[in-house]
C-alpha cells in the first residue's frame, strides 16, 4: 500500500470518529435549551450568506476540491490507474447507487416532493465507513481497505454528476459564462505547466463565486479546481515536487478534522420536538433508511457477484464474497454525503421534509454501521492480517 493511501486511511478513520462526536453533540444541543442559540447562529448572516450557507456551499467546496485532487491522483497513479484495478469497484459502485435509489422510489413514488430525494441513499460517507472499519485494526486486509476506498471515490464521482445534472436550477447565463472562462483558464494553466498553486486558487475563487451565482451548486467548482491542479512539478516528477500532492497533504487534516465535523454539526442537529413514531415510520424516512441499509448492500453485492461470475472482474487478493458483503453493508453509512444531497433535494419544500429525511439518514446509517461492523468482525480472521 502506498504512503498516500496509508495516510488517507489513517486521517479518514480518525476523522470518522470526530464526525460521530460532532453529530452527537449537534443532536444533544438541538434538543436542549441551547436549541435557539444553535439555530440562530446557523441562520445568522455574514457577507450576504447565512452561516449554514457558508458551511454547505463554501467549506464543502474545499471538501469537494479534495475529492477532485484524490480522484485525479488515483486515476493517474493510484488504485484506479488501470482498467483491471478500476473495473471491480466501478461495477460495485454503480450497483450501489442504482439499487438504493430504486428502493427509495419504491417507498415514495406517490409523493412528487419526496421523489426529489431519490439520490439521498445513493451516497457513501467514506470517512464514517473507514472510521468503523478502523475499529477492527489490522485484522482488515489492506486489499479490502483499498477496495472500499476505490468504491467510495467512484461513488463520490457519481454524486458529483448527480448534483450537476439534477440539483441545479435557475441558471444564470452570465455567471455560467464567467464560470466557463475560469474553467478554461485553469486548464490552460495546467497545459502550460503552471505549477504555482496560489494562481490556481485565485482563479478557483473566481470560479466558485461565479458558480455560486449561476444556479449550479457551488461545490462543483471545488471538483473542477481539484482536477485542474497539476500532478507533476516543473521537473515532470510527481513525488516531492507535485503541486497536487502538496495541496492534498495540506488540505486533508483541515477537511477531516474541521470542515466535515463542522458540516455534521451544522446539519445533524435535528429537533425531535413534535416528532412522533408515526412520522418516523413514514415513507420518506423509511425509504431513505431502507435505501441505505438494504439497497446499498443489495446493489453493491449483487453487482459484484455478477461481475465475478461473468468474468468481467476478479476479486482482489485476500478478499472473498463474504468480505464484499460486509463492506457493502458499511457503504450504507450515508451520513454527511446523504445529508448534503438532502439539503439540495428539498430546497423550498416544507421543513418537515428536511427533518424526516435527516432522521431517515441517521437511522439507516446507524443500522448500517452497527450491522456492517458485526458482519465484518465475523468474516475477518481473529488475529491481525
Curated annotation (Swiss-Prot):
Name of the coding gene: nhaA
This protein's UniProt keywords: Antiport, Cell inner membrane, Cell membrane, Ion transport, Membrane, Sodium, Sodium transport, Transmembrane, Transmembrane helix, Transport
Principal place of residence: membrane
The protein, known as: Na(+)/H(+) antiporter NhaA
Family the entry assigns: Belongs to the NhaA Na(+)/H(+) (TC 2.A.33) antiporter family.
The species this protein was found in: Photobacterium profundum (strain SS9)
Short name of one Pfam family: Na_H_antiport_1
Entry GO CC: plasma membrane
Compartments it resides in: Cell inner membrane
Spans through the membrane: 14-34, 49-69, 87-107, 117-137, 146-166, 171-191, 201-221, 250-270, 283-303, 324-344, 356-376
NCBIfam families recorded: NhaA, PRK09560.1, PRK09561.1
Reactions catalysed according to its record: Na(+)(in) + 2 H(+)(out) = Na(+)(out) + 2 H(+)(in)
Protein's membrane topology: Multi-pass membrane protein
Task performed by this protein: Na(+)/H(+) antiporter that extrudes sodium in exchange for external protons.
GO molecular function, one term: sodium:proton antiporter activity
Phylogenetic classification of the source organism: Bacteria, Pseudomonadati, Pseudomonadota, Gammaproteobacteria, Vibrionales
GO biological process: regulation of pH
HAMAP family in UniProt: NhaA
Gene3D superfamilies assigned to the protein according to its UniProt record, in alphabetical order: Na+/H+ antiporter like domain
